[in-house]
Amino acid sequence: YAKFAVSCRKVETMTQQLRFIPFKSRSDKGWAEAWALYEASFPDCERWDGTGYDRAFGDPHFEADGIWRGDEFIGILFHWNAGDYRYVEHLAVSPRLRGQNMGSKALAAFCQGRRVILEIDPPEDEISVRRQHFYQRLGFVANPYAYIHPSFRRPFHPHRLVLMSYPEALTYEEARGFADFIRERVLRYSEHENPELPRL
């Protein structure tokens, strides 16, 4: 399939090869399965609609990767290139692969040689605590800054998140620059017209 030749990053693991292949449009091979996984994995407030992706595909900072093991689609990793770091916006692995550590393998592979930032819910219950520990086992650090993120879709409900960074903590200036990047670039593809958040 021709699209497989475009910017394919291969990552060797102990028993298999993972490939990160960027989608360029919603007509690409695997997008329907990727979209179904996306909708099943994230609530409405954390998702864009399809037209937002149509516009974002033309942004050189954005990449929507399908994760493949051979010819088998296994997950998604949607991320942004902010120059000094990558922002992982959405990561999900097919539920049929639970127990195989594919999420940790894919994220560890993606992080090699990079600075990476992502957001998680505050560790206030068993699930959110487990999620934070998952990222910490991979080398991510929780940052102490007050960070409020608006939802992507109406009605907007700002919510507190924790910034996790790899392989080291963020300075305040770095965290503030990240908030500016989200507000000024990422949210232009959401339903916001003039977002005021996030800010530090």
Annotated model-derived regions:
Residues L163-L170:
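Conserved beta strand-loop-helix elements of the APE1-like EEP
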Residues G66, D71-N81, Y85-A92:
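Conserved beta-strand in the GNAT
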